[in-house]
C-alpha cells in the first residue's frame, strides 16, 4: 500500500469511527423515545393525570354498556356526562396525535442511525469487518424496534383497544417495509459498487428489481438535476440507490458524496463528481476490501429480509401466516452460502409454525408423505420431519451460533416425537399401525434424549420393526423423494452428532454409550436398506431393454440426455437416487470409515451396474456439470454436493438459476417445473454415476471405497471460516434463533455458550409462535490457524473430539466414534450386517469374497482379491459372459 493509499485509508477509517460513534450516541436517544412511546401506549390522560389504559378502558366500556342497556329509560346524570365524555375523547385524540408525533421521531431517528451505520459498510470494509457493523445495525436498531412493536401489538390485543391496535399495526408494517427496502437496496449497491463476480447473478437480479422503481421515485429525477441527465446508466443506478436508503442524500448529488467521502478531496469515495463533464464517475471504494465479508453481508441481508417478511406474514394473518416469501429469501441465502447453516434453522422455524397452523393441509392430505392411511399421530410426525431435518443440518454447520442454537431446537422437536404420554411409559413401545417415518424419528428421539438406559436396551424390537418397514416401503414406492431426502439428512447429521451426546463440562464422556450405539446403528441400518433397495431395482433386464437412440429436443440443452431404457419409467427407483447421491457426496468429502460392509458392497454394485449399462449401450458418461442442475432440487444438496465455490458461493448454480429463470429468482416462488419424468430420473442417475465415479477415482481401490479417517476437529468450531479471512467477526447474528444454551435436560451438555434467552425459544416451539429471543451482541470467533479450503467446510462437522475437549486441551485417545459402527452389535438382537473381526476391529479394508457384477470391459483392473498370473481376472470373464448373454437375448 502506497503512502497516499495509507493516508486515504486512515481518513476513511476516522470517518467511519466518527459515524459509528455518532450512531452509538443516537442509540441512547432511540431507547428513550421507545420508552416514552411505550408509556403513551399503556396509559391515557384522565383529568390531567396519567392512568393505566386498561383501567380507563374498563370503566369506559362499563359506562357505555350501562347506557345502552337503559336507553329507553332516562338515567340520571347521563345528559350531564356527555360533555365530560366529549372532553375525554378530545384528550384521547390529542394523545393519539402525540403518539403519532413520537412515532415520527422514532422513525426518522432510525433512518438516521441506519444512514450512518450503512454508510460505514460502503466507506471502509475493513472497519465494518472489525466492528461487525451489519450485525450491530440489525440487533441494536432494526430488530430492537421490531421486537418493541411486537410486544406493544400483543399488549394492545389483550386490552381490547381496536384504535390503538390498528395504529400500532400500521406503524409496524411501515417500519417493516422500510427495513426490507434498506437491505434489498444494500444488496444491489454492493453488487453495483464492488462487482463481485461470484455473486453477479444474484446482484444483477436485485439491481434489475430494485433500480427501476428507485429511479422513478428518486429525488434526483424529480428535481430534474442536470447531473442526473448527463450521468450514465450505472452512475444513475448508484445515485438512485444511494438516495433511496440514505437520508443525507435525498436532496443533492453532492450530499451522496459527502456521505461516503466526508471531504471533497478524498479519493476513497465510490461516487465522485467530474468537473469536466459535470457528472458522476465511479471509483472503487477500497483497494483492500474483503470479498468474503461482502458475501457474508449479502447472505445476512437475505436472512434479515426473510425474517422481516416472516414478521409481516404474522402481522397480516396471525392465525394462518403465509411464509412463502420468507422461504424464498432463505433459499436465496442457501444458494449464496450453503455452508453457513443459518437458513436451515430459519426454515426449520417456518416448518414448525406451518405444522402447528396447517390443520387445513393435514385434513386435505397434502402434508402426508406416504400414500397409505396413517393415523393422526403419524401425520403429526410426518409434518415434523422437514423441521427436524433442517435442525439436524443446521446443527452440523460450521457456524457456531447456528449450530448451537439449532441443537436446542432439535432437542425440543425430537422430544415431541414421544407423543403426549407423560406417564413414564416405555418410549420403545409402538403400534402396529405406526408408519416408518414416525418410528424412524422415534429411534433418534430415544438416542438424543436422556432416556433411561433400560429403555435403550429394549429398543431392539423397535429397531427391527423400523428396518422391516423401511424395506417394505422402499420396495413398494411409498416414500416420496422429499421424505427420503429429509430422512437422509437426519441420518447423516445424527451420525455426526452422536459422539457428542453426554459430554460433560470437563470434556469427559458421560453414560451415553448406548445412545451413541443406537444413533449410529440407526444411520447405518437406513443406508443398508436404501442401497439394497436400489440394487433390487437395477436388474440386468432393466439395464439392457428399452434403450433408444432418439434424442428429445425438448430437454434442456445445459445437460446432455442419456437413455436409461425402462429405468426412466421406474417410479420406485426414482425417489431413492438423490438420497444415495447425498450419502456418496458426504463420504467423498469427509471419509467413509464408518460405512459397513453391506453399504460398501451396495455402492460398488450400483456403480458397476451403471458403468456396465453405459459401456454396453455406447453412451458417453455424464460429467460433473450435471451436479449443478441436480443441486437445485433441494437446498440440502447444496450443502453436501462437491460444487465449485468462489468465496463460499456456488457461482455456477447461481448462474444456472438466473439464466434459466428458475427458483428462487422468479417472483412467483415456484421451483423449476419439469413435467417429463424421464428428465428427472435421468438427472438423478447421471448425478449418482458422477459421484460414484469421483469416489472410485479418489480411492486406490474402487470396490472397497475405503478412505483415510477424517482429521480430529470440532464440528462447531470456526476453523472453516478462518481460511476465508472471516475470523475477526461473528459469522451470523442469532436474533431469530432459539437459545444456544443447552437446557438442563438436553443431551448436548457442552458447546458454544448461549447468547439468547432460552425460555422464549422453548415457548416458541411448544406453542407454535414465532417468538424471537432478545439477545445481546455476538461474541467474535477467535482466529485459528488452518489450511482448509472453502469447499471442505462441512469436514469440520466430522470429529472425534468434543468442543469442550478442544477448548480445554483435553483429548481422548480413543472414542467409540473413531471406530466403525459395524463393530457394535445391536443392543437387542444382532444384525447380519454388523460384522467384525475376531479381535473386534472393523472391516475397513478390502471386501473379501465380494463378487463384482456388471463390470465394463474397458474399466481398470480390480485388486480386490489375488488371482494366479496364468488365469484371466474373474471380472473380465464375467463381463464377457454377460455380454454374450445380452447378445443372445437381443438376437
From Swiss-Prot:
GO aspect biological process, one term: nuclear-transcribed mRNA catabolic process, nonsense-mediated decay
Record field: compositional bias (Polar residues): 810-822
A GO molecular-function annotation: telomeric DNA binding
Keyword presence, Glycosyltransferase: no
Keyword hit for Nucleus: yes
Ranges in a coiled coil: none
Modified residues (Phosphoserine): 261, 263, 265, 268
Location within or outside the cell: Nucleus
Biased composition (Basic and acidic residues): 48-64
Entry keyword set: Nucleus, Phosphoprotein
GO cellular component: cell division site; cytoplasm; cytosol; telomerase holoenzyme complex
Stretches the record annotates as Disordered: 48-86, 795-822
The protein, known as: Uncharacterized serine-rich protein C2F12.03c
Amino acid at each position: 500500500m502506497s503512502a497516499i493509499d495509507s493516508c486515504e485509508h486512515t481518513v476513511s477509517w476516522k470517518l467511519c469511527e466518527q459515524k459509528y460513534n455518532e450512531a452509538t450516541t443516537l442509540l441512547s436517544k432511540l431507547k428513550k423515545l421507545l420508552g416514552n412511546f411505550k408509556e403513551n401506549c399503556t396509559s391515557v390522560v384522565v383529568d390531567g393525570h396519567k392512568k393505566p389504559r386498561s383501567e380507563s378502558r374498563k370503566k369506559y366500556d362499563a359506562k357505555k354498556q350501562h347506557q345502552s342497556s337503559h336507553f329507553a329509560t332516562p338515567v340520571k346524570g347521563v345528559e350531564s356526562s356527555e360533555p365530560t365524555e366529549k372532553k375525554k375523547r378530545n384528550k384521547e385524540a390529542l394523545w393519539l396525535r402525540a403518539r403519532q408525533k413520537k412515532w415520527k421521531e422514532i422513525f426518522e431517528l432510525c433512518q438516521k442511525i441506519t444512514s450512518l451505520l450503512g454508510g460505514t459498510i460502503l466507506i471502509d470494509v475493513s472497519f465494518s469487518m472489525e466492528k461487525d457493523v451489519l450485525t450491530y445495525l440489525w440487533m441494536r436498531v432494526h430488530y430492537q424496534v421490531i421486537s418493541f412493536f411486537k410486544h406493544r401489538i400483543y399488549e394492545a390485543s389483550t386490552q381490547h383497544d381496536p384504535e390503538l391496535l390498528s395504529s400500532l399495526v400500521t406503524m409496524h408494517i411501515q417500519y417493516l417495509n422500510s427495513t426490507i427496502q434498506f437491505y434489498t437496496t444494500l444488496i444491489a449497491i454492493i453488487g453495483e459498487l464492488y462487482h463481485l463476480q461470484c455473486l453477479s447473478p444474484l446482484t444483477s437480479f436485485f439491481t434489475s428489481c430494485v433500480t427501476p422503481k428507485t429511479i422513478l421515485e428518486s429525488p434526483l429525477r424529480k428535481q430534474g438535476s442536470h447531473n442526473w441527465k448527463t450521468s450514465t446508466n450505472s452512475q444513475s443506478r448508484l445515485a438512485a440507490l444511494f438516495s433511496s436508503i440514505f437520508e443525507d442524500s435525498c436532496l443533492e448529488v453532492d450530499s451522496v458524496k459527502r456521505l461516503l467521502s466526508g471531504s471533497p478531496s478524498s479519493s476513497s469515495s465510490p461516487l465522485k463528481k467530474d468537473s469536466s463533464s459535470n457528472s458522476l464517475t465511479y471509483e472503487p471504494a477500497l483497494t483492500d476490501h474483503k470479498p468474503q465479508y461482502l458475501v457474508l453481508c449479502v447472505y445476512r441481508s437475505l436472512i434479515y429480509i426473510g425474517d422481516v417478511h416472516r414478521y409481516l406474514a404474522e402481522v397480516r394473518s396471525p392465525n394462518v401466516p403465509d411464509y412463502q416469501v420468507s422461504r424464498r429469501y432463505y433459499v436465496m441465502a442457501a444458494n449464496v452460502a450453503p455452508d453457513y447453516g443459518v437458513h436451515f434453522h430459519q426454515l426449520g422455524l417456518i416448518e414448525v409454525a406451518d405444522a402447528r397452523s396447517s390443520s387445513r393441509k393435514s385434513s386435505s392430505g397434502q402434508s402426508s408423505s406416504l400414500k397409505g392411511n396413517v393415523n393422526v399421530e403419524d401425520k403429526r410426525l410426518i409434518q415434523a420431519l422437514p423441521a427436524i431435518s433442517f435442525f439436524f443440518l443446521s446443527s452440523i454447520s460450521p457456524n457456531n451460533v447456528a449450530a448451537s442454537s439449532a441443537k436446542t431446537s432439535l432437542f425440543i422437536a425430537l422430544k415431541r416425537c414421544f407423543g403426549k404420554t407423560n406417564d413414564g411409559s416405555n418410549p420403545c413401545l409402538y403400534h402396529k399401525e405406526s408408519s416408518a417415518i414416525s418410528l424412524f424419528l422415534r429411534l433418534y428421539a430415544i438416542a438424543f434424549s436422556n432416556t433411561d438406559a433400560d429403555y435403550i436396551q429394549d429398543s431392539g424390537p423397535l429397531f427391527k420393526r423400523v428396518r422391516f418397514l423401511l424395506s417394505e416401503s422402499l420396495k413398494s414406492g411409498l416414500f416420496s423423494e422429499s421424505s427420503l431426502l429429509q430422512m437422509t439428512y437426519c441420518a447423516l447429521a445424527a451420525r455426526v452428532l452422536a459422539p457428542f451426546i453426554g459430554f460433560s463440562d470437563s470434556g469427559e464422556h458421560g453414560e451415553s454409550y448406548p445412545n451413541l450405539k443406537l444413533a449410529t446403528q440407526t444411520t447405518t441400518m437406513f443406508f443398508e436398506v436404501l442401497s439394497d433397495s436400489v440394487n433390487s431395482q437395477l436388474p440386468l433386464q432393466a439395464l439392457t431393454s428399452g434403450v433408444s437412440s432418439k434424442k428429445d429436443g425438448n430437454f434442456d440443452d445445459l445437460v446432455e440426455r442419456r437413455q436409461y431404457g425402462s429405468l426412466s419409467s421406474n417410479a420406485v427407483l426414482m425417489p431413492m437416487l438423490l438420497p444415495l447421491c447425498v450419502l456418496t457426496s458426504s463420504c467423498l468429502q469427509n471419509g467413509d470409515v464408518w460405512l459397513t460392509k453391506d453399504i460398501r458392497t451396495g455402492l460398488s454394485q450400483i456403480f458397476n451396474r451403471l458403468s456396465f449399462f453405459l459401456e454396453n449401450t455406447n453412451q458417453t458418461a455424464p460429467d460433473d456439470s450435471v451436479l449443478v442442475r441436480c443441486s437445485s432440487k433441494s437446498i440440502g444438496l447444496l450443502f453436501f454436493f462437491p460444487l465449485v465455490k468462489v468465496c463460499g458461493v456456488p457461482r455456477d448454480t447461481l448462474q444456472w438459476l438466473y439464466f434459466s429463470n428458475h427458483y428462487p429468482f422468479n417472483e412467483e416462488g415456484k421451483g423449476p417445473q419439469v413435467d417429463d419424468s424421464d428428465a428427472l430420473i435421468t438427472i438423478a442417475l447421471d448425478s449418482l454415476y458422477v459421484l460414484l465415479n469421483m469416489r472410485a477415482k479418489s480411492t486406490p481401490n474402487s470396490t472397497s471405497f475405503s478412505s483415510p479417517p477424517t482429521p480430529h476437529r470440532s464440528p462447531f468450531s470456526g476453523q472453516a471460516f478462518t481460511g476465508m479471512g472471516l475470523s475477526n467477526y461473528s459469522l451470523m447474528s442469532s436474533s431469530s434463533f432459539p437459545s444456544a444454551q443447552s437446557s438442563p435436560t438436553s443431551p448436548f451438555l457442552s458447546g458454544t455458550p448461549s447468547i439468547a434467552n432460552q425460555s422464549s425459544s422453548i415457548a416458541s416451539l411448544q406453542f407454535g409462535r414465532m417468538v424471537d429471543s432478545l439477545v445481546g451482541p455476538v461474541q467474535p470467533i477467535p482466529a485459528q490457524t488452518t489450511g482448509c479450503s472453502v469447499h471442505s467446510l462441512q469436514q469440520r462437522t466430522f470429529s472425534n473430539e468434543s468442543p469442550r475437549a478442544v477448548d480445554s486441551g483435553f483429548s481422548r485417545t480413543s472414542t467409540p466414534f473413531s471406530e466403525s459402527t459395524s463393530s457394535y452389535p445391536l443392543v437387542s438382537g444382532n444384525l447380519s450386517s454388523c460384522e467384525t473381526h475376531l479381535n473386534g476391529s472393523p472391516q475397513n479394508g478390502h471386501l473379501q469374497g465380494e463378487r463384482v457384477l456388471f463390470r465394463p470391459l474397458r474399466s481398470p483392473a480390480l485388486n480386490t482379491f489375488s488371482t494366479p498370473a496364468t488365469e484371466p481376472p474373474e471380472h473380465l470373464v464375467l463381463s464377457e459372459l454377460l455380454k454374450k448373454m445380452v447378445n443372445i437375448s437381443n438376437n
